């Protein structure tokens, strides 16, 4: 229904009666909503709820066409028959539409669970929506013949939530339908990355003339001692940003925004370069750490309640150092479990076992697993791929762990120093 209402005459190839099928359906939609504006998903749900009336309207507008043996009288009495009749009419029209170009419908906001809806109920809703989109994309839209363009519905969904849906053939569905945005990079090769190109593009906006092909270096000419002399002679502003971020465009944008705001507050915004001392300041580290924890809360709020998140935050109070061993983790976990037993009305699911809780920390990119005395560093976001959307944390006595730099200040782990 949303696709039928969205499509315009300019999208349809110039064929006899090419747009007539869409126009007919649109007239049904307009009549149903008394000439309302473009329907949202809630209106589509309303059609489902009042399917008898909608089936009757469709029948009137398609008068003279056969209805595959089903009558309006019978569909009014049976919800499934109503829905089948409505879907068939929409599907029949869409199969006859010849598009000039591809049309993609993006469905966002799914990874924000309303607090009044229980987690398991919401997962069932998303699972149903995912299966419906899969069915439309593969069984209907992909089979429209002789059309230059095709329609596609894309769910904007976090990998961890997709993994929670437990869909059949989930790996194949992801491989065939997902768009993998590769923002990851390394300290030595970041200048070839899409993330760095995005940052350059961001700084080039509103420039009278982009005379610098590498405008980032004009704004950030910081000369920073290398944190790894074996790998590189010096560090740069961008490597510093990578250390405290999760290699996401929004992280880079937020860092720039905080730096700019602090420089304005200090009255040094007339400078034509970003000030390194501002980046090193407690104010910056506090504000960025607050942003990092806010993002973490948004991620965890999909699964857990506000009260459970408050108890989760208490875990950081048991650490004196940001780096800890496997044995230290187990000792602190037991202390933390005692706190949960004494203060929580019931034991949260994330406290099922020491390993499951460590996995949650890893999935949330709160910790990095350090292998072979610092030779290898494993972050969940760096290990993820379309074929491995839920990498497992390394769990053995010879592994060290460290909290992410981005949350040091607000987690009371001290200052981050490069």
Q: Could you describe each region identified by the protein language model?
A:
Residues 25-32, 59-81, 136-146, 182-185, ...:
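Charged, low-complexity, helix/coiled-coil-prone segments
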Residues 231-418:
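C-terminal leucine-rich, beta-strand-based interaction scaffolds used for sensing/assembly
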Residues 1-48, 176, 184, 188-207, ...:
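Extended charged low-complexity segments that act as oligomerization/scaffolding linkers
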Residues 3-12, 115-119, 142, 164-166, ...:
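Short, solvent-exposed secondary-structure capping/transition elements
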Residues 39-58, 135-147, 177-198, 245-257, ...:
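Hydrophobic transmembrane alpha-helix bundles
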């Amino acid at each position: 229904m949303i696709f039928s209402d969205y499509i315009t005459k300019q999208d349809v190839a110039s064929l006899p009666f090419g747009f007539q099928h869409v126009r007919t359906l649109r007239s049904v939609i307009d009549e149903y909503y008394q000439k309302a504006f473009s329907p949202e998903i809630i209106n589509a749900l309303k059609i489902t709820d009042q399917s008898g009336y909608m089936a009757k309207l469709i029948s009137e507008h398609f008068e003279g066409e056969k209805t595959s043996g089903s009558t309006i009288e019978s569909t009014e009495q049976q919800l499934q028959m109503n829905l089948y009749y409505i879907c068939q009419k929409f599907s029949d029209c869409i199969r006859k539409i010849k598009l000039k170009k591809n049309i993609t419908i993006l469905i966002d906001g799914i990874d924000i669970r309303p607090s009044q809806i229980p987690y398991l109920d919401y997962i069932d809703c998303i699972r149903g929506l995912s299966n419906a989109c899969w069915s439309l994309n593969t069984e209907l839209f992909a089979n429209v013949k002789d059309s230059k363009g095709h329609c596609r519905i894309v769910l904007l969904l976090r990998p961890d939530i997709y993994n929670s849906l437990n869909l059949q053939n989930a790996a194949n569905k992801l491989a065939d339908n997902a768009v993998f945005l590769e923002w990851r990079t390394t300290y030595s090769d970041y200048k070839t990355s899409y993330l760095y190109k995005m940052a350059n593009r961001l700084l080039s906006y509103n420039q009278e003339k982009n005379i610098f092909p590498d405008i980032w270096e004009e704004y950030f000419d910081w000369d920073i001692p290398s944190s790894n002399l074996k790998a590189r002679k010096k560090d740069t502003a961008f490597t510093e940003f990578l250390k405290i971020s999760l290699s996401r465009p929004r992280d880079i944008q937020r860092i720039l925004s905080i730096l700019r705001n602090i420089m304005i507050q200090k009255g040094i915004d007339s400078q034509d370069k970003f000030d390194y001392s501002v980046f090193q300041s407690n104010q910056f580290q506090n504000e960025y750490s607050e942003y990092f924890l806010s993002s973490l809360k948004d991620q965890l709020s999909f699964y857990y309640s506000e009260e459970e998140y408050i108890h989760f935050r208490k875990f950081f109070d048991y650490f004196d150092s940001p780096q800890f061993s496997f044995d230290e983790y187990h000792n602190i976990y037991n202390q933390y479990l005692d706190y949960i037993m004494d203060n929580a009305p019931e034991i949260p699911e994330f406290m099922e076992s020491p390993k499951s809780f460590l996995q949650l920390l890893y999935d949330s990119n709160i910790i990095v697993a350090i292998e072979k005395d610092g030779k290898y560093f494993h972050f969940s976001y760096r290990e993820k791929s379309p074929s491995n959307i839920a990498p497992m944390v390394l769990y053995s006595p010879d592994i060290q762990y460290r909290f992410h730099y981005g949350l040091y200040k607000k987690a009371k782990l001290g200052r981050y120093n490069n």
